[in-house]
Curated annotation (Swiss-Prot):
<dbReference type="InterPro" id="IPR027413">
    <property type="entry name" value="GROEL-like_equatorial_sf"/>
</dbReference>
<dbReference type="GO" id="GO:0051082">
    <property type="term" value="F:unfolded protein binding"/>
</dbReference>
<feature type="binding site">
    <location>
        <begin position="87"/>
        <end position="91"/>
    </location>
    <ligand>
        <name>ATP</name>
    </ligand>
</feature>
<feature type="binding site">
    <location>
        <position position="415"/>
    </location>
    <ligand>
        <name>ATP</name>
    </ligand>
</feature>
<dbReference type="InterPro" id="IPR027409">
    <property type="entry name" value="GroEL-like_apical_dom_sf"/>
</dbReference>
<dbReference type="InterPro" id="IPR018370">
    <property type="entry name" value="Chaperonin_Cpn60_CS"/>
</dbReference>
<keyword id="KW-0143">Chaperone</keyword>
<keyword id="KW-0963">Cytoplasm</keyword>
<dbReference type="GO" id="GO:0140662">
    <property type="term" value="F:ATP-dependent protein folding chaperone"/>
</dbReference>
<comment type="function">
    <text>Together with its co-chaperonin GroES, plays an essential role in assisting protein folding. The GroEL-GroES system forms a nano-cage that allows encapsulation of the non-native substrate proteins and provides a physical environment optimized to promote and accelerate protein folding.</text>
</comment>
<dbReference type="Pfam" id="PF00118">
    <property type="entry name" value="Cpn60_TCP1"/>
</dbReference>
<dbReference type="GO" id="GO:0042026">
    <property type="term" value="P:protein refolding"/>
</dbReference>
<dbReference type="GO" id="GO:0005737">
    <property type="term" value="C:cytoplasm"/>
</dbReference>
<keyword id="KW-0413">Isomerase</keyword>
<keyword id="KW-0547">Nucleotide-binding</keyword>
<dbReference type="GO" id="GO:0005524">
    <property type="term" value="F:ATP binding"/>
</dbReference>
<dbReference type="InterPro" id="IPR001844">
    <property type="entry name" value="Cpn60/GroEL"/>
</dbReference>
Length: 547
């Protein structure tokens, strides 16, 4: 085991604070509508330009191990805020740095760090309660657009695209962001349920121009196993022919004489039919087939349930107003499933999302949820160069998460105003002793940091702006750094999602309180005598890799 270096007390906290400040200073320049860009060097390809706080934070690694520990702890604040609310990462970082800075001064002055932490916790509880109390539900499409615009750094086009997407797919629908191949940003909405499997044979095509199958008012057979034996299909096919309606078969595969017969019947015009392979694999396939069954009001035919193919009746088939199948995708629109059943399935998937620990599983479950609940909207972000597209895509991602958060928990005035107003409430908090009171005071001072930083980035005097905003007793009154005017922030469309602001202060205080209560730090001693690789003579070509 290699030797370790140990730092104590003031020395440890000073080193840590230096790391916190370096990270916070790099991140805070991006805050607000007049925040600046940060350029990140990439080991391959062009540098990346971004205004996204968490992206900047993730790039920072410091040489000094103790400084780096401080920086990494605050980086955790940004990451946690990004995970929880998807935005507010810069605000969280600025708050954390402010709390740590004030807290370190108090500890140096001889106050009890544990009491300071208790005071900080009390203050955060009061701030969250105040945010929730003053939160306003998002009602109109315009408000969603405003949230998106603010989060995308004042880009109204992005706000409008997101509002349109949410209007079309609903709050539960999935919105994905991709890079476009053109200059224009565009919105593409897939209504109904779509899965990535196309027709098994091109002979099923009904629209030769578009090379796709289009059926109206179709029956849907959902089968888990392969279909190769014609005899077991015959009774069902005859029943469907009697109704004169088209049939879509979703199965693991359709092959052999079953496929040949379906194709021949289709070509002769006796039977409107198409077959597609079931989506997904293994257990996920079972779940997706069950989703399709619930959406269309049918039954997933499975031998586990003891249902044999030859015993399937028309009542077991799903129904849909429209089914479209092309070479790669199948879309089912307006399935005949009961609303109650669909809602129960949605609730079940939501519960699984809460419980899962795997990001991949969560993503797949969210896709399934969207397909059942609303649909999928794709925003394709355009731009003149690859660097511009990437930078814009970052902002669209942030804005998308912010609009989601706004719909979930409502909105508060933006520009750091909600936190400023909450800071006034902290003057009334009763504490057990003076050290706890100082903890509350630390948070009260820190709450003005985001508003101050937004003003500084806009070239204004932060302290003057904060003072003027606090003079007025109106909750929504604040400073619009884009125009340089004071006024009602909500009316001006400068709003933040409550969830984003709440997550920012909770995460910032949580990590900052841990840093303040740190008394010792341990890190590996730097290796002496360069980075020669073990067992290799100096200059052996591999040593420090200095080519």
């Amino acid at each position: 085991m290699s030797a370790k270096e140990v730092k104590f007390g003031v020395d440890a906290r000073d080193r840590m604070l230096r790391g916190v400040d370096i990270l916070a200073n790099a991140v805070k320049v991006t805050l607000g509508p007049k925040g600046r860009n940060v350029v990140l060097d990439k080991s391959f390809g062009a540098p990346r330009i971004t205004k996204d706080g968490v992206t900047v934070a993730k790039e920072i690694e410091l040489e000094d191990k103790f400084e780096n520990m401080g920086a990494q702890m605050v980086r955790e604040v940004a990451s946690k805020s990004a995970d929880l609310a998807g935005d507010g990462t810069t605000t969280a970082t600025v708050l954390a740095a402010a709390i740590v800075r004030e807290g370190a001064k108090s500890v140096a002055a001889g106050m009890n760090p544990m009491d300071l932490k208790r005071g900080i916790d009390l203050a955060v509880e009061a701030v969250v309660a105040d945010l929730v109390k003053n939160s306003k539900k998002v009602t109109s499409n315009d408000e969603i657009a405003q949230v998106g615009t603010i989060s995308a750094n004042g880009d109204a086009e992005i706000g409008k695209f997101l509002a349109d997407a949410m209007k079309k797919v609903g709050n539960e629908g999935v919105i994905t962001v991709e890079e476009a191949k053109s200059l224009e940003t565009e919105l593409d909405v897939v209504e109904g349920m779509q899965f990535d499997r196309g027709y098994i044979s091109p002979y099923f095509v009904t629209n030769a121009d578009k090379m796709r199958v289009e059926f109206d008012d179709a029956y849907i057979l959902i089968n888990e196993k392969k279909l190769s034996n014609l005899n077991e299909l015959l009774p069902l096919l005859e029943a469907v022919v009697q109704t004169g309606k088209p049939l879509v078969i979703v199965a693991e595969d359709v092959e052999g004489e079953a496929l040949a017969t379906l194709v021949v019947n289709r070509l002769r015009g006796g039977l409107k039919v198409a077959a597609v392979k079931a989506p997904g694999f293994g257990d996920r396939r079972k779940a997706m087939l069950q989703d399709i069954a619930i959406l269309t009001g049918g039954q997933a035919i499975s031998e586990d349930l003891g249902i044999k193919m030859e015993n399937v009746t028309l009542q077991m088939l799903g129904r849909a107003k429209k089914v479209m199948i092309d070479k790669e995708n199948t879309t089912i629109v307006n399935g005949a499933g009961k609303k109650v059943d669909i809602e129960a399935r949605v609730a079940q998937i939501k519960a699984q999302i809460e419980e899962t620990t795997s990001d991949y599983d969560r993503e797949k479950l969210q896709e399934r949820l969207a397909k059942l609940a609303g649909g999928v909207a794709v925003i394709r972000v355009g731009g003149a160069t690859e660097i511009e597209v990437k930078e814009r895509k970052d902002r669209v991602d942030d804005a998308m998460h912010a609009t989601r958060a706004a719909v979930e928990e409502g909105i508060v005035p933006g520009g750091g105003v909600a936190l400023l107003r909450a800071s006034e409430q902290l003057k009334r908090i009763k504490t057990a002793n003076d050290d706890q009171k100082t903890g509350v005071e630390i948070v009260r001072k820190a709450l003005s940091a985001p508003a101050r930083q937004i003003a500084i980035n806009a070239g204004e005097d932060g302290s003057v702006i904060v003072g003027k905003v606090l003079e007025k007793d109106q909750y929504n009154y604040g400073f619009d750094s884009q125009t340089g005017e004071y006024g009602d922030m909500v009316k001006k469309g400068i709003i933040d999602p409550t969830k984003v602001v709440r997550a920012a202060i909770q995460n910032a205080a949580s990590v900052a309180a841990l840093l303040i209560t740190t008394e010792a730090m341990i890190a590996e001693l730097p290796k002496k005598g360069g980075a020669g690789a073990g067992g290799m003579p100096p200059g052996g070509g591999m040593g420090g890799m200095d080519f």
